């Protein structure tokens, strides 16, 4: 008989799932979403883009290789809660420094196991991502459903200020420095900074609310707009700063949330997807050619293609639902992708987009 205390996941539409608590025995509310990656749970947990969300893993066994410091994408886990079919009791990897359960307890992350995750994922797929409450304290289903309904929705929710750096800092180049880039930290992952560093880029990471004038005063070779959590429609002041960067003709590369903010700076609209794209197996097609990339995603919003101005070209589309996955300005050195070219976790098909950014900066230097 299990010694783990009972826990309940209650969704705002009244659906409930009873299982067992296996980490911190607390209570949290957030948007319930699912991730289809088979591995990479540590990178998922520490991705700031998951702030405000309870993440369900579709793979049935999670935690077997433990946790280490090196693979974290930030200094702490950002998920509100974590849901799995079965949490591994065995930690078997030479790089492991602690078990997943111990790691989650250390950070007071509430986690649930022993539910039918297939049923939960099908429900989210059919009904959409929604508010939920996960508790090992309150076991009254009606009470938890009401708490879920009272929690803040993801629409119009601003979370970048929660995850961004409080002070600017430099991430040095791994080799001879070729370029200096300023990164707007909306929730940046370490592997993005590493990808730039490997290409000879020194990156100055600045808070999400940094003014464009302050960035331009640094005379950067380029600007990187990072991934991050929340609704891009809540970031009006940041979008206004990005507009100033666009008119300054500095090379810009946006990914994920940064891609959405760039779209809004171009005058386009963004909208909420039914259940989003989260996982390492999303097929993306290059519009101008025949190339297809298998890509890593983590987003619940997308840019509305029909609202983009004529000077912005859609470069990539999702083969599953035809969402805009990439853009470029026809005359300015500006590109973006909706997915995560740095992967972590995920395939490496899209790493070349960092090289595209390097080439934009090279060409701009020659022009100047």
Q: Model-derived features: where do they sit?
A:
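RNA-binding accessory domains that recognize and position tRNA/RNA substrates
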Residues: 1-213, 217-218, 232, 344-349, ...
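Flexible loop residues that form catalytic
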Residues: 87, 228, 301, 332, ...
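Proline-centered loop/turn at the N-terminus of a beta-strand
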Residues: 110, 180, 251-253, 269, ...
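Active-site-proximal beta-strand elements of phosphoester/diester hydrolases
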Residues: 180-185, 295-296, 335-339
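Catalytic beta-strand/loop cores that center a nucleophilic Ser/Cys/Thr
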Residues: 291-332, 368
């Amino acid at each position: 008989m299990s010694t783990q205390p009972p826990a309940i996941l209650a969704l705002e539409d009244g659906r409930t799932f009873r299982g067992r608590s296996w980490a911190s025995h607390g209570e949290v509310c957030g948007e319930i979403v699912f991730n289809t990656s088979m591995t990479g749970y540590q990178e998922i947990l520490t991705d700031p883009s998951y702030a405000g969300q309870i993440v369900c893993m579709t793979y049935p066994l999670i935690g077997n290789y433990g946790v280490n410091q090196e693979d974290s994408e930030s200094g702490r886990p950002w998920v509100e809660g974590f849901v799995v079919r079965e949490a591994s009791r065995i930690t078997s990897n030479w790089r492991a420094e602690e078990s997943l359960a111990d790691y989650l307890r250390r950070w007071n992350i509430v986690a649930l196991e022993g539910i039918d995750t297939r049923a939960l994922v099908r429900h989210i797929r059919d009904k959409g991502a929604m508010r939920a409450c996960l508790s090992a304290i309150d076991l009254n289903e009606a009470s938890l459903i009401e708490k879920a309904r009272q929690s803040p929705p993801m629409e119009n929710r601003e979370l970048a200020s929660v995850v961004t750096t409080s002070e600017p800092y430099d991430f040095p180049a791994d080799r001879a420095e070729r370029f200096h880039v300023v990164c707007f930290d909306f929730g940046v992952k370490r592997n993005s900074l590493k990808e730039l560093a490997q290409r000879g880029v020194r990156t100055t990471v600045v808070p999400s609310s940094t003014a464009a004038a302050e960035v331009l005063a640094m005379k950067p070779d380029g600007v990187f707009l990072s991934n991050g959590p929340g609704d891009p429609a809540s970031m009006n002041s940041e979008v206004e700063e990005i507009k100033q960067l666009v008119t300054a003709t500095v090379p810009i590369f946006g990914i994920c949330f940064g891609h959405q903010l760039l779209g809004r700076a171009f005058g386009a609209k963004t909208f909420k997807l039914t259940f989003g794209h989260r996982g390492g197996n999303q097929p993306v097609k290059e519009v101008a050619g025949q190339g297809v990339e298998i890509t890593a995603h983590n987003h619940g919003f997308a840019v509305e293609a029909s609202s983009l101005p004529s000077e912005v070209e859609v470069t990539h589309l999702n083969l599953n639902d035809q969402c805009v996955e990439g853009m470029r300005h026809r005359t300015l050195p500006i590109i973006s992708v909706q997915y995560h070219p740095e992967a972590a976790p995920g395939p490496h098909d899209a790493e070349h987009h960092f090289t595209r950014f390097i080439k934009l900066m090279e060409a701009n230097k020659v022009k100047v």
